[in-house]
Amino acid sequence: MSMTRQEIQDLCVKSLEEKMVGTTDKGIANGNGFYQYFFTNFPDLRVYFKGAEKFTAEDVKKSERFDKQGQRILLACHLIANVFTNEEVFKAYVRETINRHRIYKMDPALWMAFFTVFTGYLESTGSLNDQQKAAWMALGKEFNAECQVHLKNSNLPYVH
């Protein structure tokens, strides 16, 4: 089933209703919870978090660093979901995200892989249905496509 940009945006935004950012305990827990899920289910990717390579979910839960990082990642997901219908703004945000992450020398395949991780987190908390997951993966495909173009144009490693 093919979806329009508006349908994708609406479904992604809806899936985030229970995962709001904010300074409340729940808002902070929403973001930190993503990293607890991430560190538990994708331990091989902890290498990208200097100083936290050996962290467990329990370490993440108690970490102010991941409280803050969780807010940043959730905010980023809210932003890309909410601007998806504005293709130029969406692409500009993708490029800016790449620029901010250059210093980490990430495997370029991880840009698409993120959406598998993120939808897995949403599923694990009961915040995602099949249609919303398909929408996130469609958004992720577009996100990744712009990532790879920008990486190539920046003379950085990219997925061919």
From Swiss-Prot:
Binding site for heme: 101
Gene3D superfamilies named among the record's database cross-references: Globins (1.10.490.10)
Membrane keyword on record: no
Cited PROSITE patterns: GLOBIN
Location in the cell: Cytoplasm
GO CC term, one of those recorded: cytoplasm
Primary residence: cytoplasm
Coiled coil ranges: none
Globin domain boundaries: 2-152
A molecular-function term among this protein's GO annotations: oxygen binding
Keywords noted in UniProt: Cytoplasm, Heme, Iron, Metal-binding, Oxygen transport, Transport
Family: Belongs to the globin family.
Function: May be a globin and may play a role in oxygen transport.
Protein name: Globin-like protein
Species annotation: Caenorhabditis briggsae
